[in-house]
Design a protein with these regions (language model features):
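Mature extracytoplasmic domains of secretory-pathway proteins
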Residues: 72-109
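N-terminal propeptides/low-complexity segments immediately following signal peptides
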Residues: 5-6
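C-terminal amphipathic alpha-helix
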Residues: 9-75, 105-159
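Sec-dependent N-terminal signal peptides of Gram-positive bacterial secreted proteins and lipoproteins
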Residues: 1-2
């Protein structure tokens, strides 16, 4: 059975497009599970946010200085960190369908950053495509923030 092979191969969980866990066991509309999930996902996110900010500062410095080699290095480091973050997100066992869906959107947002980095690394960067992805990323980021805030509000109803 192909499905069993996919589940047993942990290497397939590396890409952000492959949900690593079955959703059949997830709770729906359970404030306590949402609260738990937000805590464990938040723990993964906090460390990564600091690293991402540092990487972004490195990219900004490289852009401002016009140093193409420094920019390439910064983009590659950022891409590696984003892949690592997506893997860490996948490694977290969540209990609620709502936070599981939010995690997938976080990974999609991260993948937009990777695509933007790939454009920067290309020999002839497509500025229009980069601008489109940047807008899409900004919108995705806002939507995830709204969704996470709604989940935090729901989680606060848990006793």
């Amino acid at each position: 059975n192909t499905r069993q092979q996919v589940k047993s191969d942990p290497e397939l969980n590396v890409t952000a497009h492959t949900p690593p866990h079955s959703t059949s066991h997830l709770s729906q509309d359970n404030a306590a599970d949402i609260k738990y999930d937000l805590i464990v996902l938040g723990a993964v996110s906090q460390t990564a946010k600091k690293k991402a900010q540092d990487s972004f500062m490195g990219m900004q410095y490289a852009i401002d200085s016009g140093n193409r080699n420094a920019l390439m290095t910064a983009v590659k480091q950022t891409t590696t960190q984003i892949h690592g973050l997506n893997q860490k997100y996948d490694a977290v066992t969540l209990k609620s369908a709502e936070v599981t869906a939010a995690r997938e959107r976080l990974k999609e947002e991260n993948n937009l950053q990777i695509e933007m980095g790939n454009i920067i690394l290309s020999d002839s960067p497509d500025r229009q495509r980069f601008a489109e992805l940047s807008n899409k990323h900004d919108n995705a980021q806002k939507m995830v923030e709204i969704e996470m805030e709604a989940l935090r509000i729901k989680a606060n109803t848990a006793s």
